[in-house]
């Protein structure tokens, strides 16, 4: 008998009917440790149950979910339900109807033990946190070289702050060698000192997949780093030891890129605000100085207009008038004295004597005031007020004899 080819939906539907009708799979009870626990916004719960070698995807519908149960990653449970196929994806999963809590898984016990130990040593103390540089020149990224994480980090950084230099140190982010590679990367950047900030991260996953970032060796290397480290491991609900010892925890790798870089738009906005404040401050200072100058000028003018100044000016005017009057009076008195002296000198002048009819007799340019030395026929000059006479002596009389 030749069978026709089935559509994928037909094949998945057929498998689903087989699983539902199986007496064991239709009422299956399993035990395991919860991993990838997530409560959807619809109210449905999605998780995986795992043991040392395998895992089984599970669903708890909202109507069957008991919120009083403290379910979380690492909790061991006994689950009862049925196996069916999610036809769209062709994936079989356990649809849980009942849950019984059995205990806590070994990895979560180890996680809590290490967390408590490092906390007591002070590795989580905020005083050891190094501030993240606000405007880095270079950022180191420690993650897988492939996948969405590194692409998201690069895209966010280049969009926000394109001038920054990105240095990738590729590592495996899960597996036996992962922890040692992460430690080597941190030591490398601290030795080179060529970056301002480090981002250590990976995408989401189960506690097993994230376990490298819960490794004590990685935790101590992160704590000892002289370069500030942003931890960006998993999704927002995932927490690792690396998150607690790092200088800053980011909920996602993209958020880490935003924390590590300023936004050019924010920088331009802040610069605009600074410019505006400086301009306003300068304008206010100029206006204040102008007001102060006007106040000083007004005070000076008011002082000059005061009665005290006016009185002093009047007093100075009076003193000036007195000085001028004294000078003029003294000049007048001195002028009168000069007139009198001039008159006296005029009266004593030979010219004044001539005005009264007197003359001056000279011989050879010398004044003659006696007949002694004169002889008949001597030539003499007689000076009058308006001219000279040349005479010859023809007679000499002596009054004494």
UniProtKB/Swiss-Prot annotation:
The keyword Cytoplasm applies. InterPro entries: Exonuc_VII_L, Exonuc_VII_lsu_C, OB-fold_nuc-bd_dom. Keywords: Cytoplasm, Exonuclease, Hydrolase, Nuclease. GO terms for cellular component: cytoplasm; exodeoxyribonuclease VII complex. GO terms for biological process: DNA catabolic process. Transmembrane segments: none annotated. Its EC number is 3.1.11.6. It is found in: Cytoplasm. One of its GO terms (molecular function) is exodeoxyribonuclease VII activity. It catalyses: Exonucleolytic cleavage in either 5'- to 3'- or 3'- to 5'-direction to yield nucleoside 5'-phosphates. Heterooligomer composed of large and small subunits. PANTHER family: EXODEOXYRIBONUCLEASE 7 LARGE SUBUNIT. HAMAP family: Exonuc_7_L. Belongs to the XseA family. Bidirectionally degrades single-stranded DNA into large acid-insoluble oligonucleotides, which are then degraded further into small acid-soluble oligonucleotides. This is Exodeoxyribonuclease 7 large subunit. It comes from Clostridioides difficile (strain 630). The gene is xseA.
């Amino acid at each position: 008998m030749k069978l026709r080819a089935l559509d994928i939906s037909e094949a998945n539907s057929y498998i689903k009917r087989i699983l539902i009708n199986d007496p064991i799979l239709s009422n299956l009870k399993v035990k395991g440790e919860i991993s990838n626990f997530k409560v959807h916004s619809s109210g449905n719960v999605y998780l995986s149950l795992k043991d040392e070698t395998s895992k089984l995807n599970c669903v708890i519908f909202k109507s069957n979910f008991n919120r009083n149960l403290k379910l979380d990653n690492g909790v061991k449970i006994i689950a009862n339900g049925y196996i069916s196929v999610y036809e769209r994806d062709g994936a079989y999963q356990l649809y849980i109807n009942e849950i019984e809590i059995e205990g806590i898984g070994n990895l979560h016990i180890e996680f809590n033990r290490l967390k408590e130990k490092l906390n007591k040593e002070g590795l989580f103390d905020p005083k050891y946190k190094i501030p993240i540089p606000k405007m880095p020149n270079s950022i180191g990224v420690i993650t897988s070289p492939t996948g969405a994480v590194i692409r998201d980090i690069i895209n966010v950084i280049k969009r926000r702050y394109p001038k920054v230099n990105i240095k990738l140190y590729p590592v495996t982010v899960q597996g036996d060698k992962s922890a040692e590679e992460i430690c080597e990367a941190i030591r490398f950047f601290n030795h080179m000192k060529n970056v301002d900030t480090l981002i250590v991260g990976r995408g989401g996953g189960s506690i097993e997949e994230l376990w490298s970032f819960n490794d004590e060796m990685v935790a101590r290397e992160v704590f000892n780093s002289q370069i500030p480290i942003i931890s960006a491991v998993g999704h927002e609900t995932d927490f690792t030891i690396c998150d607690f010892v790092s200088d800053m925890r980011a909920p996602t790798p993209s958020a880490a890129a935003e924390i590590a870089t300023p936004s050019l738009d924010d920088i331009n906005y802040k610069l605009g605000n600074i410019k505006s404040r400086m301009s306003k401050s300068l304008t206010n200072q100029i206006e204040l100085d102008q007001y102060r100058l006007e106040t000083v000028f007004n005070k000076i003018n008011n002082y000059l207009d005061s009665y005290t100044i006016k009185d002093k000016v009047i007093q100075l005017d009076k003193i000036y008038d007195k000085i001028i009057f004294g000078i003029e009076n003294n000049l007048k008195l001195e002028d009168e004295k000069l007139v009198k002296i001039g008159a006296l000198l005029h009266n004593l002048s030979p010219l004044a004597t001539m005005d009264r009819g007197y003359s001056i007799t000279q011989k050879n340019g010398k004044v003659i005031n006696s007949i002694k030395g004169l002889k008949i026929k001597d030539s003499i000059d007689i000076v009058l007020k308006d001219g000279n006479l040349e005479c010859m002596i023809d007679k000499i009389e002596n009054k004494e004899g």
